[in-house]
Amino acid sequence: LHNMEIQAERIIDPRLKTQAVAIISSNHSNGSIISLSSEAKEEGLCRGMKVSLVRKMSHRTQLLPYNQLLYDRINQYVYKTVSSFTPVVEPYMLNEFFLDMAGMDSIYDNIKNVGFSIIKRIKDQISIDGTIGISNNKLVSQIVTAVIPDVVHKINRGHESQFLAPLNPKFLPTVRVKSIQRILKFLLIKQISHIQVIAEQSEEFKILFGIHAKTLSREAKGHDTSKVKSYRYRNHILEQRILPEDTNDKMILYAIVKDLSERISFKLRKR
């Protein structure tokens, strides 16, 4: 569900549909952007930008507080909707879900049509748009939704490496490791295809990327064996807080983490 927060706010207030909108952690000058519309991006804004800088750069952008209750309710509705198509659903983030459709061939003749049905049902009920990526694994399906604008797009088994080849390495999870980023930048590697070629020389690849070599090589080829894990409410406790202002004060952060830990402990004891 791309930019779900922005979509939700525009449903609540249709006047926002053509305006530059940014969701912020707080109105304090030290708050930051959590989500923003395409119009806000055109104003030069980006995620993580401080509110103080936003106010200097753009006077047209509407700044809205993070409405956790609203977003959680939408997320729960979408979870229930996709769960009616398969019993194995894994919520990954607030606006992202993995569905395991293995063994569903006897029920659904065409998985792409199932994807369109899911998107249509969500759109009809709550007016939220989304995209679906279909592939043999979670990694490729997730990348599909990030780079392909189609409502539903499928990568056939065996075509994962070809699909990934022209893409920026930033889409591979292992590339988020700082040391890997530095190596790729030094080697001027700007496409996953370059990683695929280097990975063919296994010894040299291992020397370059060390303990991350095997994982990076698998990801570059579109291999992922991680399973979709069904959501279990009883085994999942979530406590979170949006700070009124960003801070690196260790004492404040420690106190918040301690408070969240105590809340979780209390819930566990009640079980």
What are the functions of these language-model segments?
Residues A8-R10, I34-L36, S141-I148, K227-R232:
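Short acidic, glycine/serine/threonine-rich loops at helix termini
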Residues S179-R271:
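DNA-contacting surface of Y-family translesion DNA polymerases
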Residues D109-F171:
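Long, highly charged, low-complexity intrinsically disordered interaction regions
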Residues L99-G103:
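Short beta-strand-to-loop capping motifs
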Residues L1-L94, F98, R218:
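Residues that scaffold, gate, or flank divalent-cation-dependent active/transport sites
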Residues Y92-E96, S135-K138, R271:
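Short Gly/Ser/Thr- and Asp/Glu-enriched loop/turn motifs at secondary-structure junctions
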Residues Q7, D124, F186:
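Acidic, metal-coordinating catalytic segment for phosphate/diphosphate chemistry
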